[in-house]
Structures are given as C-alpha cells and as structure tokens.
Amino acid sequence: MADVLADQLRSATLSDATNNEDWRRNLNIPARDNRQQTEDVTNTKGLEFENFGLKRDLLMGIFEAGFEKPSPIQEESIPVALTGRDILARAKNGTGKTAAFVVPALETINPKVSKIQCLILVPTRELAMQTSQVCKTLGKHLGINVMVTTGGTTLRDDILRLQDPVHIVVGTPGRILDLAGKNVADLSECPMFIMDEADKLLSIEFTPVIEQLLQFHPKDRQVMLFSATFPISVKEFSDKNMTNPYEINLMDELTLRGITQYYAFVEEKQKVHCLNTLFSKLQINQSIIFCNSTNRVELLAKKITELGYSCFYSHAKMQQQARNRVFHDFRNGVCRNLVCSDLLTRGIDIQAVNVVINFDFPKNAETYLHRIGRSGRYGHLGLAINLISWEDRFNLYNIERDLGTEIQPIPSTIDKSLYVYDNPETIPRPINIPAQPSSAGNAQSAAPNQGPPPQQQRPHQGQENWQNQNGRHNGSSQQQQPRGPHQNRGRGGGRGRGGFQGQGQGQRNYNNNYRGGRGGHNQGQHQQQMPNQQS
C-alpha cells in the first residue's frame, strides 16, 4: 500500500505548495546539518514532504524546524495515516518516529473546532514534554493548541488549562485517565489515539489504564502504535482494539548502524576509575551514563563531580520541577554529562549526545537497545561503552544473542571517526523546551544555543543549588580542580580479547596481563566502592 501511495504522490501535483516556491524564500530555515548519516535514515524512496499534500502552514513549520526530507518511517507512515487507517509501526530508535505521527495529526486537526482531536500517550514525563514541543514547533503556523499533562504536577492547573480550547493532548496515561474520569478532558469526539513507545505503554503497569482510556474515545477512532520493539502484548492489544491495522516493520536489524559498541571487564570497585579514564581519553560532546538504581545514580553523579567534571543527574524519585530543569538544561548544553536511571531510555532525542556509557550493565536486551539508542540519533554516529563485571557476563552473552549483534572488547585507542565530527559546534541544538520556573541560579544564564563546556571545566554551582531540593547534592560542596594527565596507567581486559589502557590518580599500575574478572587494587581516595546494584 505504501509503495503505491508513494508512486502516486511522487507523480501528482498535490497542492499549490508544489506550484509556488515563493513562500519558501521567507522561511527562517536553520543551518543545514552536514554530518554523515547512515542508511537508517537515508534509505528512502525519494519522496519530499511536499509530495504528501500537506497544508502550506504545516510545511512551513516542518522546514523551519530543520527537516529536509522524510525518513523511511515517515515515508511509510504519513501517507497511510492521512487515510485514517490504523497503524502498527516498528522502527529503530532515533529514526524520526515522532514526526511520523505528529505530521499527519497536525494535518488532520481542524483548529476551528474547539475539541480535543488527538491524544498522544507516552510513558514518561520527559518524553511528554519533548513530544508536545515537537507538536508546537511543527504546527506553530496552524493555530493549534497543544497541552502536555503528566503526573507530578497539580491537577488544578490542568483543569484550568482545559477551560480553553485544546486540540492535542500529550501526556502519561494515569494523569489523562484522571482528567477523563472527572469529565474534565472530553475525549468523546477525539478521533486519533496515538501511543509512542507502545511496548512500554502496553506493559502490565500501563495496560489497564490504556484499556480504560479507549472507552472514552469514539468507536470509529484511528489507533496508531509506534515503537522499536513489539512484544506479544502489542499483538494482543492490536487484535482486540485495532481495525485491520497497516503494519510497518523497518527493523531489518535491531541496533542503529551508526553506533559502535564496546565492553570492558572491570571489577566493581574499579568502575569509577575506569569512567575517569574514559573521560580523559574520549572526545565527548555530551554523554549519558546509566545506572541500575536511583541510589547509584546520585552517588555516581557526586563522584563524577568530585573528579572535576560537569555532571547532572536525573531519576524517577526526584521532584518534577527538578527533573524538568535537568532535562531542559542538559538538552541546551549547560552540562556535558548526565547520570540517570532508565527514566531517560525512552524516546529522548538529544542530538548532541555522542557517547552512552552503561556504568551498570542492563539485565535485558530491550533496556540495552533503548539505552544505546540515546546516541547516534537520526542516522548519525555514536559510541556505546559497557562496563561489565563478572556477574554481567551471562547478560552480555544473552543480549548479543537476542539482538543479533557483537559487542567488541574495547581497544586501547578508539578511532575518533567512529563518533567525533570535524565541527561539533555545528551540531544542531534540539528543539528548545521552555524551562520550568525554578530558582536555578547561575544555570539560567546559559544560552539555548551554547555548546557544552569543556569536559574538564568545573561544574556549575547553580546546578547544585536547585538540585538540593531533592535532599542531596548533585556533586560535592567543595569542588576539586580539574585533573591533568597522570603517570599511573591502567589496563583492563575483556573475555581474553584485548584490554583498555587508561589513566587515573591514586591508582597502582594494573597487571599488564590482566584478563577478565581480576583487576588492580583500589588505592585512590576517590575510588570508593559503589553500593550494591540491588540497592
């Protein structure tokens, strides 16, 4: 079906937008992103956004947001979605799934009708903020009102906002069910029901809420599901609640082609030292570092700050205001490193991130796939480094098997062409998300287009002030000066194939014949052992 539509769209003159190019001359189009892209986003049928017959005002928003040509998932889904058919779409992380459903939603909505006409469900608050901003940016010339609502905010504010016309509601399932159940959000005439990260939304914790939400929609609704992975729960939901869905599967392989994956076998007590070595060796634009528990997130962020690197942290137990601020500031380059739990594995698009580090190795392939997908966004290059302990060796094998990929042992030197661009300052900053009001202090002074500070710059003191509201510092109260190169060097190996050579302070030399599960002794004052991962 999509191939037939593509041929028809390519040959047809669909709107006055294709006949008159004068309107494009006055657009405020951002500088072109000339970074190398992989076939994940370049393997298209040659369609243009103009071929979809979209409103000129929508095309203006698309081009002013920096979009040039549709990606494969956008080519497949947009024309089908515009026909009103249900869709099951599976595509890799970071290949343009959000625009694949936002564009047809914006095209379909009638701004003159003061009713909720599209509901977009996402699993996390950060993804809700990001998706709502994409809707606002692409539809800024359409006069469409977008509302984002999530848990962790007062219900009263949402009730007041719904007194005004709202056309698109983006949010997490629990909060939207509260609003619909109180007859505050009227979904009776909402024809579009969209789920992003559908595999997560159809997990045990969310499925009952999703089923209840569907009852508030009309029977002839259009249901669209988008995700990178489709477990059996998605098929069960589709069979029960979707009508002859059009299935799109662009997952010829599971991992992004632009991401290079490495592992290093490291004893638990040596992980911080290994991370310090990575910071000194890698050319990081921005990095996301994952831990398996909220307690370890805060402790590791504090340790990184003590080592002299700028670092934020984020996890689900933080206050919503602080989470919003972290998300906003990190996206806008205020800080170079972010330590987080799996809270930010879903859909978060920060194109400046070129390195992902699994400080704690994940337990399953699904989590691993979503974590490493935070780098290498939209066909660009990225690096994923996994710190593996002896207990993780079976998870490593299982994930390699399940994903059909091989995670290589980390070499002594990583080729910068695998993840570094010639002019990193030209990397486009993400679509700006307004900051939530807070007493952020000095952190507010960072300009939205400012790149991240040098990797060894001292952290922003203002960050600590506002993140203190979570009960703990995001770093030490007495910042240390950035460390220069040291003479002590270390090596760590992996599965008997190669090793990793690095630098660190207060560490004795590793055994040069180190292989696998043994490592050097911990002599540095900053190499305290992290707590157990189950904490």
Curated annotation (Swiss-Prot):
Q: What is its main location?
A: cytoplasm
What is the annotated localization of this protein?
Cytoplasm, P-body
Q: Which residues bind ATP?
A: 91-98
Q: Which residues form the Helicase C-terminal domain?
A: 258-418
Question: Which CDD domains does this UniProt record tie to the protein?
Answer: DEADc_DDX6, SF2_C_DEAD
GO terms under cellular component: P-body
Name the residue ranges with Low complexity bias.
Answer: 506-515, 523-535
Q: What name appears for this protein in its UniProt entry?
A: ATP-dependent RNA helicase DHH1
The organism's taxonomy opens as: Eukaryota, Fungi, Dikarya, Ascomycota, Pezizomycotina
